[in-house]
C-alpha cells in the first residue's frame, strides 16, 4: 500500500486483509494444500477464513517471528524499520513463534485482547492486555488516542502521512494526548491542529 493510503485485499482462500500505509504483503496466487503463508512488511489487519486443514501463517520480514492461525481476526504491526513487531488478537486464538536472544524458538498462545510486542534488538517479548479498539482504529482512518505519549502520536502520523517530525524542546516529550481524529480527509498539519 502506498504512503498515506490504506486499502483491502482478498486472498486466494477468501481471507480479507486491511493494509495500513506503506505496507507490503507477499503471497502466492494459490495457497498450498497444507498451509497458507504470507510475508508482511508493515501493518495489516487479518480476517482469516477458517480452514482446519490448512494453517494460516504470517511471516514478518527480516525477523524470526511467525503467527499461526486456523481462522481468526488479528492485527500485526511489522514495519521492518520499527524496533519491534507487535500482534493484537481480536478473536479466536493464535500462536506466535519467535527466536529469543539465545537463538531458541519460543511460542506463545494468545487469547482475545492480548497484545505481544517482540523487541527486535533484545529478542524478547512482552505480552499484555490491550485496548483493541485503539490498536485497530487505523482501519477506519481514525487515530484513537488514550493518554498516548507524543512520540507515539508522531510515529502514527508519520505512517499516515509519510512525513517526519522534529520535536524541539524536551518538555514536549512528556506531553500525552487523548481523543480521536479522523485523518482520511486531512493533511498532516490539519491533523496536528485537531490534536
Where in the sequence are the language-model features?
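A residue-level detector for the "anchor" residue at the start of short, highly conserved motifs
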Residues: 1-187, 193
Amino acid at each position: 500500500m502506498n504512503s498515506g493510503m490504506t486499502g483491502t485485499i482478498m486472498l486466494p482462500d477468501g481471507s480479507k486483509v486491511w493494509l495500513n500505509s506503506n505496507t507490503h504483503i507477499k503471497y502466492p496466487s494459490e495457497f498450498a494444500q497444507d498451509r497458507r503463508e504470507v510475508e508482511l512488511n508493515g501493518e495489516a489487519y487479518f480476517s482469516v477464513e477458517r480452514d482446519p486443514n490448512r494453517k494460516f501463517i504470517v511471516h514478518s520480514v527480516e525477523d524470526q517471528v511467525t503467527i499461526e492461525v486456523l481462522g481468526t481476526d488479528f492485527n500485526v504491526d511489522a514495519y521492518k524499520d520499527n524496533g519491534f513487531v507487535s500482534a493484537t488478537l481480536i478473536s479466536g486464538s493464535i500462536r506466535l513463534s519467535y527466536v529469543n536472544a539465545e537463538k531458541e524458538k519460543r511460542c506463545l498462545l494468545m487469547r482475545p485482547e492480548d497484545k505481544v510486542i517482540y523487541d527486535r534488538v533484545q529478542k524478547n517479548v512482552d505480552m499484555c492486555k490491550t485496548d483493541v479498539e485503539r490498536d485497530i482504529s487505523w482501519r477506519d482512518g481514525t487515530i484513537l488516542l488514550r493518554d498516548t505519549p507524543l512520540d507515539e502520536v508522531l510515529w502514527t502520523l508519520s505512517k499516515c502521512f509519510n512525513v517526519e517530525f522534529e520535536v524541539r524542546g524536551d518538555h514536549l516529550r512528556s506531553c500525552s494526548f487523548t481523543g480521536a481524529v479522523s485523518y482520511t480527509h486531512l493533511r498532516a498539519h490539519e491533523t496536528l491542529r485537531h490534536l
